């Protein structure tokens, strides 16, 4: 059902709960704990999903994370998990998840955040959705995105997806709906994807942990051509263990605790913004300093070493972003006159870029080779994620193309280079920042370093534990009034 069409505030029927005896205590648990309980028969997948649907109904009107809530379908799928003959082998048995509205869920419509077309329901699951379901996960809903997933705030006609930490601010984008759902405790794990930071920016905004895999590690198949190969699928989580399991499922590997490196890591620190004139705020600098101190205390070697992001690499990122709008609009058969004005301009520029042949594979290859040299004597790069607090929660879709891209560039200059390079990049919380909002940092590794990044994130999680859910919506503390 559409999230705006149900009898409850979120589209979930008011009576979805099963009364006082329902297992409300399961809401807010990590995915790994929920799955362990369902595998062992200590928890029913139906009860787990029903409890999360009830929490969704309580908070959704104030967050706006979901376009579709799959109440009946999710409960039926949960019952199938309970009856599964190999339930004890499912790594995500009974775990409620959300899926971003730009990958296919069988039987559901994929809109890519646009009203410029009327697509038919998907005939089959996207490969990453199929892998999540095969692992026992239950899709409770489809999360909101900005039109064509182009922007770093999530809003559209009649909807603004708000940050559970401060509802006056955006949950970021383009996986903003997925991030808001996790931060509000509605699901412990959500699928998203990242073409210029679309997993990492919402994770930073909402105090979550995420990993953008390197090229070819997880099936992409996002839109027409995954933005010329820049976009990758991943998950958003509240713990590193949940992230590691989600990543393993998407990558088609057996979930396992990431192995420790042989010795201390050599960590390079970079704070220089690729966008001239953008500076990191004091809270972001403090978060970096805290992480640097913990890395040194753990025995790692920390050095300053700025990567060289060439003008060609920076331009290559922008041309792929522009071209992606045009190629996706073409592949979806969109009525371009029905696009939001900002997206119409974006796609028009993208058509010119494509016709001029400005998306050049050699640009990405050259930058990857340069970064391979950079990582010859360092294991990991540490950098900021964003320059300051998330953008205000407002109808950005009503503003023009220049206003949107300027706001995006000033807030989020540190993520897109690693998309064009095809390198893995992980974001994790690093303590409270300005106005009580989360602060986060980014780790980037060479090709194939996903496990290294997950291990390092787990080590820092132990040394710098973070609050897993936004305080107002924390299932452990009840549901109060929204901030902002």
PLM regions and their residue ranges:
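An N-terminal boundary/leader segment
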Residues: 1-75, 290-300, 469-484
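Glycine-rich, small-residue loops and helix-cap segments
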Residues: 41, 52, 94, 134, ...
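Acyltransferase
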Residues: 45-50, 82, 282-306, 329-337, ...
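Acidic/His- and Gly-rich active-site-bordering loop/insert found
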Residues: 74-76, 84-157
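Short helix-loop capping/hinge segments that flank enzyme active sites or metal/cofactor-binding pockets
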Residues: 92-112, 264-266, 320-372, 384-388, ...
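A short acidic, glycine-rich active-site loop
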Residues: 117-122, 166-169, 401-413
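Short glycine/serine-rich loop segments
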Residues: 124-247, 424-431, 437-440
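A short helix-breaking turn/cap at a secondary-structure junction
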Residues: 209-292, 309, 463-484
